[in-house]
Amino acid sequence: MILITGGAGFVGSNIAIYLKKLISQSNITVLDNLKRRGSELNLIRLKKNKINFIHGDIRNTEDLKFKKNKISTIIECSAEPSVLAGTSDELAYLFNTNLTGTINCLNLAKQHNSNFIFLSSNRVYPYTEINKIKFFESENRFILKENQKISGFSLNGIDESFSLNGLKSFYGATKLSSELIIQEYSKSYKIKSIINRCGVIAGPWQMGK
C-alpha cells in the first residue's frame, strides 16, 4: 500500500491520481483531515479513480494505525501550507501539523519499514540570503544577473551548499526542522527517504485558502 497524507489536498490528490494511473493495480490510500477549504471537492476525483480515502489527522496517532495493510511507501504531503501561518492564532496548529505530524508519520514508517517521501519547501532558505540574489526586470519576467558571488547559487538555481542560516518564517522553520528529523530517522532506523524542496506549485484543482 502507498499512503499519501494530505492526499485530498491540491498536491496530494494529483500525486495519488497520477500514481493510480501509472500503477493501476496498486493500493493507493490517502489520509486527510479536510481542514483546508475545497479539499472535500477532491473526494469525488479520488473515488472515481478508485483511490481509498481515510478521514484522519496526522496529529492523532490513533488515526495512523494500519494493522491490516503493509505500507510500502509514505508520501507526506500534509501541511499547513501558508507562509503567513503563525501570524495569527494558528501557530499551535502549524507546529502540531508540520512538525509533530511529520514525526508521527516517521514513526509509522519505522513500524512498517516504509520508504518515506517528504514534500518540503523552498521556504527553508532564509529570505535574508535570497534577497541578496541580483536580477533585473524585463518586459515579461525577472532575469537573474550573471557572475553573482553567492555560495550555493548559480544561474542553474540553488544547490545544497546554499546557506540555511537566517530567518525564514514559522512555516519555513517547521519544514527545515522536519527535514533534520527525517535525516536522523533515516540514519538511526534505516528509513529510505527523499526530501523534495518544492517551489511554487500551481495547476488544476488548486483551491487557495
Where are these regions (language model features)?
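Substrate-binding strand-loop-helix patch
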Residues: 202-209
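N-terminal Rossmann-like NAD(P)+-binding domain of SDR-like oxidoreductases, especially those catalyzing
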Residues: 1-199
